[in-house]
Amino acid sequence: MSKPTADNAPNAAAKGAPAVPANFLRPIIQADLDSGKHSSIVTRFPPEPNGYLHIGHAKSICVNFGLAKEFGGVCHLRFDDTNPAKEDQEYIDAIQSDVKWLGFEWGGDVRYASDYFDQLHDWAVELIKRGKAYVCDLTPEQAKEYRGNLKEPGKNSPFRERSVEENLDLFARMKAGEFKDGERVLRAKIDMASPNMNLRDPILYRIRHAHHHQTGDKWCIYPNYDFTHGQSDAIEGITHSICTLEFEGHRPLYDWFLDNLPVPAHPRQYEFSRLNLNYTITSKRKLKQLVDEKHVDAWDDPRMSTLSGFRRRGYTPASIRNFCEMIGTNRSDGVVDMSMLEFSIRDDLDRTAPRAMCVLRPLKVVITNYPEGQVEQLELPRHPKEDMGVRVLPFSRELYIDRDDFMEEPPKGYKRLEPAGEVRLRGSYVIRADEAIKDADGNIVELRCSYDPDTLGKNPEGRKVKGVIHWVPAEGSVECEVRLYDRLFRSPNPEKTEEGGSFLDNINPASLQVLSGCRAEPSLAQAQPEDRFQFEREGYFCADLKDSQPGRPVFNRTVTLRDSWGS
């Protein structure tokens, strides 16, 4: 299996992008430690608890937690919980579970931006006292008009020159709950003519009469992200505040707050390119829409781009970590091909997944010349290379093969079973198809075959049998359900639609096929949830985390054996 790279994997990175280090942050951190600027490093991962983590977050997790671990530092998990109307404890629990599942531990207790609400409020008051913040009564529509655009400077709010005393009074009344949601905001007084739109008197506080999952009903004013981010970093002693490139334009504002407040430290913000993966959606709003409108079963549906979805589908933490390392950390935006992620999981499972046989579309085979009542216990390796021991398959007169492995009128080059043709059963004997039994509608319901008793573990004398197919014994095999998952979207860019269209128009109608009545070899009867296997000739599968039970297994296809989508 050849390893795709940014050069030979389709769309792995932006075409023409210059060569960059695997992680441009490593030499920066090393230099800071060598110079004594920092004695140790502290990073943070600050998700907003308004949805489940997706594959894009995996890169941020691996960067922040990975660098901290590599350099002997710590990484904080801090929830940016400044918008109570959209946040939920369910998301907080899921995020913690996902970070741990990926193999990382945060330093100390879980932290919340809401832990610092009192301090942030005091700093907002400090900005008012310094004449650098004011209460504004403009409506959202008016504020948008006053803000200007990239070509035109903004205009000062008519409330910009309120006195310090009036601003302190109004802000105190905002905090006391005297005003309705949206009636007033607190804004920083910076520069309405700045070419950087983020510096045009940004909002610091909004009024939201909403119950907060951590602070209850203590607050009815909440700080926005930009006012919370840098100061929280300063409080926690973050040395390297690492975020994605869309926040590059926010860095001057990040620094402005730290420069104008009596903070205990002045962290430095660094930006790297976010993970853009084709055939996926990572907008939390759109992921939530998929769930709410029941296009998928839940946030952890194995077709979703959420980490819980990838986990349930059978992806391993190592495969996702290795994928994030493979694509590198740089400042060059591009689109990574899904085939790179699929390569990573195939590479991992090829080495770690035990082999097993499962017949997805069973066709009964009766070996007419095999002694009735006789059973042989055949030993097959659990892995062709790794020492995983053996599993035992009972071989007797009746067994199942896949319906797709027999054709009455096969095309040229067909190497499976056909009338009067021979094929080897994996790890067993060579059989010949003698007769196809059909029902009243002409459907094949059973094959009558004969076997060559001298072909166990060796080729028959004087003839070459090319085809090898998988099978399971009729007696002892376990009935199971198999879910064949594929990419949720049929377009590399699901966001690209016809005028007036929706990303939902690009949903792949063949993203899930549920097969019942499948037959698995006896060793799979006691498969535990999340046990992973290579079903020989079929793909990589795992026992479903929610629905699979010993004796009644449900298997999800993680990925096919080869890329079926092409380059």
UniProtKB/Swiss-Prot annotation:
One of its GO terms (biological process) is glutamyl-tRNA aminoacylation. GO terms for cellular component: cytosol. A motif ('HIGH' region) lies at residues 47-57. SUPFAM superfamilies: Nucleotidylyl transferase (SSF52374), Ribosomal protein L25-like (SSF50715). ATP binds at E48, P49, N50, H54, I55, G56, H57, A58, K59, S60, T244, R274, L275. L-glutamine binds at D80, Y225. CDD domains: GlnRS_core. It is found in: Cytoplasm. Its EC number is 6.1.1.18. It comes from the Bacteria. Keywords: Aminoacyl-tRNA synthetase, ATP-binding, Cytoplasm, Ligase, Nucleotide-binding, Protein biosynthesis. InterPro entries: aa-tRNA-synth_I_CS (IPR001412), Gln-tRNA-synth (IPR004514), Gln/Glu-tRNA_Ligase (IPR050132), Gln_tRNA_ligase_bac (IPR022861), Glu/Gln-tRNA-synth (IPR000924), Glu/Gln-tRNA-synth_Ib_cat-dom (IPR020058), Glu/Gln-tRNA-synth_Ib_codon-bd (IPR020059), Glu_tRNA_lig_a-bdl (IPR020061). A motif ('KMSKS' region) lies at residues 281-285. One of its GO terms (molecular function) is ATP binding. Belongs to the class-I aminoacyl-tRNA synthetase family. Monomer. This is Glutamine--tRNA ligase. The gene is glnS.
